[in-house]
């Protein structure tokens, strides 16, 4: 009997370990593919030309009408971002929106460079200059 109990527990632990490993692999794949897409020349060009920018909600937005290729790229990146925010929310006991907002604040403050577009708290598009960007008062 004791051996059977140990065997059952071992199987449950094995299943759980396999699930955690699969989740980690999926997370790494999402993060890696997002980073690769962000190095895509079309993405970099659209960002540099001010066609797209960081939004306050943690997602990329269109400053002006995008080409189908840029729209597809940004849509794909936003799907990957949402997956990452969902993963982080589950791990931190937060909502997806909270994680997205925090990341949006960080991306606007730390990732945008002069000449790039970002969304101000009033939802207008601003062009980053040498000064600090205008961010939501709730940003950490």
Name what the model sees in each region.
Residues 38-72, 97-140:
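Amphipathic, charged alpha-helical segments and their helix-to-coil junctions
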Residues 31-37:
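Sec/Tat signal peptide C-region and signal peptidase I cleavage site
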Residues 74-92:
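Short, well-ordered alpha-helical segments
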Residues 1-6, 12:
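Short, Lys/Arg-enriched N-terminal segments with co-localized hydrophobic residues
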Residues 20-31:
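Bacterial N-terminal signal peptides
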Residues 9-21:
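Bacterial N-terminal signal peptides that target proteins for export
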């Amino acid at each position: 009997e004791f051996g059977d109990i140990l065997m059952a527990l071992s199987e449950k632990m094995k299943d759980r370990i396999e699930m955690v490993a699969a989740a980690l692999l999926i997370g790494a794949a999402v993060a890696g593919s997002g980073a690769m897409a962000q190095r895509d020349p079309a993405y970099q060009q659209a960002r540099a030309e001010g066609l797209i920018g960081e939004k306050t909600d943690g997602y990329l937005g269109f400053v002006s009408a995008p080409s189908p290729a840029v729209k597809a790229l940004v849509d794909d990146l936003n799907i990957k971002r949402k997956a990452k925010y969902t993963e982080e929310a589950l791990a931190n006991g937060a909502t997806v929106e909270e994680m997205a907002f925090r990341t949006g604040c960080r991306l606007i403050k730390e990732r945008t460079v002069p000449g790039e577009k970002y969304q101000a708290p009033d939802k207008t598009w601003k062009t980053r200059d040498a000064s600090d960007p205008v961010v939501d008062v709730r940003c950490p």
